[in-house]
Amino acid sequence: MSPRVGVFVCYCGANINGVVDCEAVRDFAEKLDGVVVAKTYPFMCADPGQNLIKEAIKEYNLDRVVVAACTPKIHEPTFRNCIKEAGLSPYYLEFVNIREHCSFVHMNDREKATKKAMELVAGAVERAKRLEDVPQKIVEVDKSCLIIGGGIAGIQAALDLGDQGYKVYLVEKEPSIGGRMAQLAKTFPTDDCALUILAPKMVSVANHPNVELITYAEVKNVEGFIGNFEVTIEKKPRYVDENICTGCGACAAVCPIEVPNEFDLGLGTRKAIYVPFAQAVPLVYTIDMDHCIRCGLCEKACGPGAIRYDQKPEEIKLKVGTIICAVGYDEFDATLKEEYGYGVYDNVITTLELERMINPAGPTGGHEIRPSDGKHPHRVVFIQCVGSRDAKVGKHYCSRICCMFALKNAQLIKQHDPSTEVYICYMDIRSFGKGYEEYYRRAQEQFGVKFIRGRPACIMEDPETKNLIVRVEDTLLGEIVEIEADLVVLSAGLSPRPDNPKLAKMLGLELSPDGFFKELHPKLAPVNTKVDGIAIAGVAQGPKDIPDTVAQAKGAASAVSIPMAQGQFRIEMIRAVVDEDVCGGCQVCAKMCPYNAITYVEKDGHLVAQVNDVACKGCGSCAGACPSGAMQLRYYRDEQIISFIDGVLEAHQKLES
């Protein structure tokens, strides 16, 4: 018996009907083979539109439904639920996007948009006739979560999940949690001491009964699927026993070796045995074997006997139900902007370096100085958008926090010494957050910070005084301005971590063109990813400030808690399937599979492919490569795809004749 198809065309207000003649599309659809009813409605996704579809299914005994509307990314689940409530399999729906594919791209050609919509509907009807029900598989979800990254995003997510009773493994590659926020002096717009508000959370997460900290460690491999991720972690040797070290510092006091301190961005020094900063969590010392001379003084000074020169890397294997990626960011490499002389001129520094200077616990005791001579600068110039909004260095995006960083540090400099002249050379001041515009006005009106709209072309150094000549066109005044500065601060942008591609491949995630992790939907699913059970948070997803980072971390914790709370997850089995009678065992499909989901068994004297339908993600690579057609992707079988193409071409011929 031939399937009975119903076609439902949505106006989407004027988004579709303003360009596409929806009534003509309906009239065309009514005449297609197998179509027993076709209807239009202004908003098919609204309750009246949904009821229209349900009533038509019952009245006309429909067993296939075609909806011509907007993007399936947003509304396909809505219509699947609709036909399911009417008694049909949710997989007997074929969704046609006539908004993005017709009205939006042909908005100046009503006839062309309408014809294209007709052709797409014709193809959809042919495919709908061949749709199949898709089975579902229920997997148990382990009530535990791996969080990659121990910055404020990872800490907040860990606390939220731990408070709900879930086991959390918080992995941080540095010796201490805290991330970038731990390096800051104060936070805008409230000027809170950064560590004063961060440290209590660091201590809370370390002492939480449901949170296990795994610091100085990196994720090396991730396999499996939602509910059952198998994770391999390599914990680097500290050469200090974490369970014995008391953090007293006696070892560092006798260590004769001093090297640049990475936490202070090289502005200060640390010993070969060290903690990154005084409030580090865990407060456990680490020996830097690249610089340790094995003199043994630390071992002699250590009362508890915690030094372990023979410590080896440790492999940790975990099974978790969900994962949150919160790996943070790196500061843009300002040496790539050669015209600004960073790394060449001593008195050109970055915002983060200034943060460490201004921090009372930093290398200069909270005093901004000129690196060339240690003197206090009396004229400071900030240059904005260094590594942001700059196609020349491949950074098209705005880093979002640099303007506020500069405003904060400019005010702090003026607070330390009101006589200091501070200039900010900017393209646009983007003070978008709550209280940010008022903060901007305060810098202008209360502190007298001077703003020059323009991007400096270059910086030159006076070789004798080490002063810097900043030449910039003030686009508001229409004139060239030269400033002789004691110190230049580059507002370096936020760059994705260089190992993001490696981690993305490991997790099965995508990266945006800018190198940050890609969300499932930028507006409706900003913390979810294409892999069920894996969420993203903080600057791993894209540049953002601390409030947005914390909010997104809480959102990610909420997202992964849902399947853990339910204890199980339904997987729709749109997976590869094998026709064993046709399979020749050539093994081409296994070579194409990125998930190692295909194995082979011997049957009737030759090899036959087998698919692990849980490991398989339904990408279709194997089906596309199979020379015999034995490997098919359920719901996207060859005949289903070809029938759609045939339907489009036949309709095109009919409309053109």
From Swiss-Prot:
Protein residues bound to [4Fe-4S] cluster 4? C593, C616, C619, C622
Lineage: superkingdom: Archaea
Enzyme Commission number(s): 1.8.98.-
Which residues are noted in the entry as [4Fe-4S] cluster 3-binding?
Answer: C583, C586, C589, C626
Question: Which residues does UniProt assign to the signal peptide?
Answer: none
Report the cofactors: [4Fe-4S] cluster; FAD
* Gene Ontology biological-process entries: methanogenesis
Keywords carried by this UniProt record: 4Fe-4S, FAD, Flavoprotein, Iron, Iron-sulfur, Metal-binding, Methanogenesis, Oxidoreductase, Repeat, Selenocysteine
The residues listed in the UniProt record as binding [4Fe-4S] cluster 2, with positions renumbered to this chain, are: C255, C292, C295, C298
Pathway where it operates:
Cofactor metabolism; coenzyme M-coenzyme B heterodisulfide reduction; coenzyme B and coenzyme M from coenzyme M-coenzyme B heterodisulfide: step 1/1
Binding positions for [4Fe-4S] cluster 1?
C245, C248, C251, C302
* An example molecular function term from Gene Ontology annotations: CoB--CoM heterodisulfide reductase activity
Record-listed FAD binding positions: 149-172
User: Is the keyword Ribonucleoprotein assigned to this protein?
Assistant: no
Q: Which InterPro entries match?
A: 4Fe4S_Fe-S-bd, 4Fe4S_Fe_S_CS, FAD/NAD-bd_sf, HdrA-like
Per UniProt, residues of the 4Fe-4S ferredoxin-type domain are 235-266, 283-312, 574-603, 607-636
- One Pfam family of this chain: Fer4_21
- Free-text remark on how the cofactor is bound: Binds 4 [4Fe-4S] clusters per subunit.
Provide the disulphide bond pattern. Answer: none
In which family does this protein belong, per the annotation? Answer: Belongs to the HdrA family.
Q: What does this protein do?
A: Part of a complex that catalyzes the reversible reduction of CoM-S-S-CoB to the thiol-coenzymes H-S-CoM (coenzyme M) and H-S-CoB (coenzyme B).
**This protein is called what?**
CoB--CoM heterodisulfide reductase iron-sulfur subunit A
The protein's organism comes out as Methanocaldococcus jannaschii (strain ATCC 43067 / DSM 2661 / JAL-1 / JCM 10045 / NBRC 100440)
